[in-house]
């Protein structure tokens, strides 16, 4: 079995904490939180692309 796509124990714990926090949010706050997370993911993706591009050239 490929282990690269599995979460670490620390990641599983963080996910459980996020689930608990999400259940307490109302719809507006949930949407706002989702937008913030998506923005963070896009920034992370851009950072990874930047480092990959600059490490090859």
From Swiss-Prot:
Pfam families registered for this protein in UniProt: NblA
SUPFAM superfamilies assigned to the protein according to its UniProt record, in alphabetical order: NblA-like (SSF109859)
Keywords assigned: Chloroplast, Plastid
Gene Ontology cellular component terms for the protein in this record: chloroplast
Keyword Coiled coil attributed: no
Localization, UniProt: Plastid, Chloroplast
Protein family membership: Belongs to the ycf18/nblA family.
Name of the protein: Uncharacterized protein ycf18
UniProt source species: Aglaothamnion neglectum
Name of the encoding gene: ycf18
